[in-house]
Regions:
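Nucleotidyltransferase catalytic core that binds NTPs
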Residues: 1-126
Length: 126
């Protein structure tokens, strides 16, 4: 089977079963799961709060998951996505609440004449 690379983005603060479900669901769309973990500065700017766990701890916890093939910190500059060039995804999976990220990704890709399909996962009922 050919490798299909999937990329997701997130903060993953206080890694919990909902994060596990999202990541496992994303992995079912491909054979290789890459995870871009948000930097502390981005969490402060976008969510107007300080994350419980620092970026290196969040990165370590995500990296330790058996179904995650690689994890790395997001670009230092908000709104840039050089991680796409490094991860080389065939598909980007976003959560139900990542509308702003989707818009930013589409603008960035359009400016570079790059097209990577984006799929949104639905909100899960609790």
């Amino acid at each position: 089977m050919d490798e299909k690379r999937v990329l997701v983005f997130g903060t993953f603060d206080g890694l919990h079963p909902g994060h596990h479900f999202f990541l496992r669901s994303a992995k079912t769309n491909g054979t290789h799961l890459s995870v871009s973990v948000a930097r502390d500065a981005h969490v402060r700017e976008l969510k107007d709060k300080v994350s419980v766990d620092r970026e290196q701890e969040r990165l370590r916890r995500v990296s330790d998951l058996s179904f995650v093939d690689e994890a790395f910190l997001s670009d230092e500059e908000l709104g840039t996505f050089s991680v796409l060039e490094n991860a080389r995804p065939d598909l980007i999976i976003l959560g139900h609440d990542q509308e702003a990220l989707e818009a930013s990704l589409r603008l960035w890709m359009e400016s570079r004449e790059l097209y990577i399909p984006i799929k949104r996962l639905p909100k899960i009922a609790r």
